[in-house]
Amino acid sequence: RQMCIRDSFYREDGRAQGESDALERGDFEAFLHLVQNSGESSYCLLQNVYPSSVPAEQPVSIAIAVGSAVLGGRGAIRVHGGGFGGTVQAFVPSVLLTQFRDGMEAVLGEGCCHVLQIRPIGGMTILI
């Protein structure tokens, strides 16, 4: 288990740099691929999507499974935040948004999806 954790952390550093590089060069598909790989590492190697003390309750695992099925290899989905009952972050292509939300809500309940949009420019400072 410790070997899996070390492997995940070392590779995660490279993935984070790769995500930044992909965004800088405008390669959103490469970014999504790295996000998906990072999420799979968290899920499979770190196993941080549910507490081992309550293995019968796995809402994040279920959300990732349902979301992955709906996405069908497009976009990306991963555990986000602290895991262990936290949240899932999904990058959903616009053409799949309604289908994705409907699929998630059918299993996890109405209102489980919060749709956010990423603006095309980064952070800004407003001087007053």
Descriptions of predicted regions:
Residues 2, 6-78, 89-128:
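C-terminal nucleotide
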